[in-house]
Amino acid sequence: MILVVNLNPSLDKIYTLDELPYGEASRAQTVQNTAGGKGTHVANVITALGSPCTVVGFLGGYVGQYIRHVLDKRRIVHHCTTIEGETRSCINIATSDGKQTEVLEPGPTITEGEKTEFLAQYDFELKRSDLVVASGSLPKGIGDDFYKELICRAKAQGKPFLLDTSGSALTKGLEALPYFIKPNESEVEVLTGHKLTNLNEAVQVLHELEGRGIAMPTISLGKKGALLAHEGKVYRAVPPTVDTVINAVGSGDSFVAGLATALDRGASPEEALRLAAACGTANVLEAESGVVDPEKVAAIEKEVQITTL
């Protein structure tokens, strides 16, 4: 069973308008409300692929109740810590000229008591899990080294920890040597101090990360696919070209979910990378973020090209 850590979930609201004139009232043509947060997306995809998972994290207020309702509706098991604050909302305003304006709420501040309660629940669920996936940013109040603590607790029980985050949360998390990380090209630049200009440089970074003790470092290359290193070998996945991208938000989360699902099933690194790439590509074919159609995933999976570099 996969344990999904979703510390900073959100209600994602998407408004579509013809235009957004500054300082005037605007009437939306459509409104879409979805349970968001990278961990929510991961849980959606793992469940769609037919694997069991449990979500832990923080939820509070009316938004928290809504997210619990969505998880229940999708039959995703969740044991989230109830907090006094209100779970954040993220608003995306899309206009007919193709531009998008986002308003991101700061989110709640987690208290020391809520943090302690979460850790107790995490330790309990950890015993029943085979693999841990932690995705997304950290809420205020718990410190940049919180993922590092979760990784250490998982490693103490021999559970692989897949970390997908950025910034100081990633930098601190790396100190505990998670099993897997998935920075994109810009995040690699932050980690290493230099910009990647070719595949050879990316391969070298992966070897360096593996040499530090990260068992399966991965670099996301966007439309160009992804690179994954394991036991001295580097694999590249190139997914098929998609004619029409409906919504690319959540593709990275879908990638992580596919990889976690495959690893939980005992797949080889190549097989895991293939499913991950297929899930990331399948996500762009859906209107809702972090959602895949298993039949589309299976079809795309056959077309993903895996090579050894």
Label each residue range with its predicted role.
Residues P108-T111, L138-I142, A169-T171, V190, ...:
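Short, small-residue-enriched loops and turns at beta-alpha junctions
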Residues T171, L199-L309:
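Conserved phosphate-binding/catalytic region of the ribokinase-like
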Residues D145-V234:
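Conserved phosphate/ATP/ADP-binding segment of small-molecule kinases
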Residues E102-L104, S129-G136, D164, K182-E187:
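Short beta-strands and strand-loop turn motifs
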Residues M1-V56, V63-Y66:
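Glycine-rich phosphate/adenosyl-contacting loop at the front of the ribokinase-like
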Residues T111-E149, P160:
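Hydrophobic alpha-helical segments and helix pairs
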Residues E24, A48-S129, A298-L309:
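Conserved N-terminal subdomain of the carbohydrate kinase-like
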